């Protein structure tokens, strides 16, 4: 099993914990730290949609809360026919906390695609803009 396969599997597993009673759109993410640790996250919806948190952000926040600061890949899995890339807010956080890492997109049908973060987020707002 490759590192990317392991991340996809971890994202698939954590996706099962998603709380999506309104959209039924369950997403899992798995973030790989350079230490070798994998941090999973699933989306958590709220009746006030603005309080909903995406799987990618939860994975990042979980890793950060446990002291990790260096990451080299993230996988995002959803049960869709097409692949589901991170939303704009997640792209901003991935860029700021992870940099130009590979983003592995996968669905439950076995389709995958790996993109570099700079392809998903070509003109980021970051500390150089401040």
Predicted regions and their residues:
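C-terminal binding/interaction regions
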Residues: 2-17, 66-130
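Short beta-strand scaffold segments in enzyme catalytic cores
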Residues: 24-33
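Compact, glycine-rich, soluble single-domain proteins
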Residues: 42-58
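Short Gly/Pro-enriched turn/cap motifs at secondary-structure boundaries
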Residues: 19-22
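General beta-strand structural signal in soluble alpha/beta enzymes
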Residues: 40-41, 105
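Hydrophobic "anchor" residues
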Residues: 37-38, 112
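Feature captures the catalytic cores and cofactor-binding loops of soluble hydro-lyases/lyases
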Residues: 58, 62-66
């Amino acid at each position: 099993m490759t590192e990317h396969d392991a991340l996809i599997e971890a994202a698939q597993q954590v996706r099962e914990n998603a709380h999506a009673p309104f959209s039924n759109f369950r997403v899992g993410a798995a973030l790989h730290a350079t230490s070798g640790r994998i941090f999973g996250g699933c989306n958590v919806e709220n009746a006030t949609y603005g309080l909903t948190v995406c799987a990618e952000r939860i994975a990042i926040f979980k890793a950060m809360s446990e002291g990790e600061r260096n990451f080299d890949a993230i996988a995002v899995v959803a049960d869709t026919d097409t692949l589901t890339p991170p939303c704009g807010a997640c792209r901003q956080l991935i860029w700021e906390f992870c940099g130009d890492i590979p983003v592995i997109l996968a669905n439950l049908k076995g389709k995958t695609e790996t993109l570099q973060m700079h392809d998903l987020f070509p003109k980021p707002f970051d500390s150089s803009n401040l």
